[in-house]
Amino acid sequence: MSNTGASLKGLLLAVLLVSNMLLTKEGVTSLPICSSGSVNCQVSLGELFDRAVRLSHYIHFLSSEIFNEFDERYAQGRGFITKAVNGCHTSSLTTPEDKEQTQQIHHEELLNLILGVLRSWNDPLIHLASEVQRIKEAPDTILWKAVEIEEQNKRLLEGMEKIVGRIHSGDAGNEVFSQWDGLPSLQLADEDSRLFAFYNLLHCLRRDSHKIDNYLKVLKCRLIHDNNC
């Protein structure tokens, strides 16, 4: 086996081991999930929300970790933060900025908004997980977090589709999501420009994962606990 193949195999193994430990610690893996096509599934809406909230919190944790590590390793002294304001591909989606604004939105609209943001990240996360491997001397901790975030975003999206289907009696919503066209920026020959593209993407990921985490907590409180939390 080549060194590259062995390295990739080792990285994937590390992803599986570490993600299993972290998910178990967060309590995500302990929650029951209905398999696709299950009949008379007994998982309650509350349990589905529990799992979604824990999973979104885990994704935000990883997003913050990977951003902070990238910032410390590659962005110091480059002035990236001043250029990253309002540069997210999801900025076209109208999203509440704080808890007070979030509470003013009807739950159906908020659910569709969460679906829209999650689906807006499908494509960029796939390419982030592959392109980050091309960064010079990228540490394994950044590599496996990129792979893990992509996988867990898929799981959260699947969970949210179950929740929306339960609330809307099978309708997964007609949400609008933002297309991402940033792949060429992640492949630029100029190192500073390429690193800024990664920095900006990770900055936006941290921002959006935080929003989703907060939106889900508001929805859980409203729909499961009748705002008594």
UniProtKB/Swiss-Prot annotation:
Q: Name the predominant localization.
A: secreted
The UniProt entry, under InterPro entries, shows: 4_helix_cytokine-like_core, Somatotropin/Prolactin, Somatotropin_CS
Gene Ontology MF terms in the entry: cytokine activity; hormone activity
Signal peptide range: 1-30
Keyword annotations for this protein? Disulfide bond, Glycoprotein, Hormone, Secreted, Signal
Which SUPFAM superfamilies does this UniProt record tie to the protein? 4-helical cytokines
Q: What GO cellular component is one of the record's annotations?
A: extracellular space
Tell where it localizes: Secreted
Q: What Pfam families does this protein's entry cite? A: Hormone_1 (PF00103)
Q: Which GO terms describe its biological process?
A: estrogen biosynthetic process; negative regulation of endothelial cell proliferation; photoperiodism; positive regulation of canonical NF-kappaB signal transduction; positive regulation of cell population proliferation; positive regulation of miRNA transcription; positive regulation of receptor signaling pathway via JAK-STAT; prolactin secretion
User: What intrachain disulfides are recorded?
Assistant: C34-C41, C88-C204, C221-C229
Recount the PTM note. Answer: Three forms are found, non-glycosylated, glycosylated and one form seems to be only O-glycosylated.
Protein family membership: Belongs to the somatotropin/prolactin family.
What is the protein name given in its UniProt record?
A: Prolactin
